[in-house]
């Protein structure tokens, strides 16, 4: 039975060596492979105590991977789905809000690059940014700034 626990721990370390995982995500992955008598929660506690598993590192990693392509609401929604606590979400939201306009502008530039010539095209560009999770305020500011740059 001890060998199964080591196997489960080895599997957890292999997952964590590839990228950071949230406690909830890693627990879900390990539960699929757990045998009767394996205590996944105890293993997760052990990994957290040994600093192999960290919610804050996972949050930073996810924000870093997603920030260049997505808006605040999409990133925060994904963090929430991974079980990140509300206090951490509040801190992350405050950090993300400072550069949402710049990120929206960069995404717009990569996708479109030119200012919409008619209302239909403008609506299409705005919908694209909204689907990426950017706030209406950031989208409006990015579109206005793009229009000023074209003039």
UniProtKB/Swiss-Prot annotation:
Transmembrane segments: none annotated. InterPro entries: RecX_HTH_1st, RecX_HTH_3rd, Regulatory_RecX, WH-like_DNA-bd_sf. It comes from the Bacteria. Its main location: cytoplasm. One of its GO terms (biological process) is regulation of DNA repair. It is found in: Cytoplasm. Keywords: Cytoplasm. GO terms for cellular component: cytoplasm. Belongs to the RecX family. Modulates RecA activity. This is Regulatory protein RecX. It comes from Janthinobacterium sp. (strain Marseille).
